[in-house]
Amino acid sequence: MTVAFMLELLQPKEGEIILDVGSGSGWTSALLAEIVGRQGKIFAIERIRKLKEFGEENVRKMGYENVTFLTGNGVRGWPEKARFDKILVNAAAVDIPPALTEQLSPGGKMVIPLDDARGSMVWLGKNEDGTLQERRFSGFAFVPLIDR
């Protein structure tokens, strides 16, 4: 139910370019690939190489060709592929990484869990002038987003 809630907050749409941070087994990358369709693109980052390879294999087996994987530090995002219409983060950050908000397009949205006392899920919307709107929801638990 957590993934469904995150996707409901993110509101991915056909043709969008989305960054999937902490892509793991490839499950959320595949869901996003289906939603954005052939005109869209998913960029999936996983810091654990073997898990990235596992996710990449799973997504390929399912026939999705619009997903590109990277072994890397999700806190830093993927600046070479930025700007993203949406960013989905699948691990809890201590703070919202500035690199991710910078890589979000004006009009874009990001969903990110925070490692705080409330177990917050944060929805961010980036206005056309670059300012951010924020909504928080509590009661979630995630593995930590590691900066390395």
Spans of model-derived segments:
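Short, surface-exposed secondary-structure junctions/capping segments
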Residues: 146-148
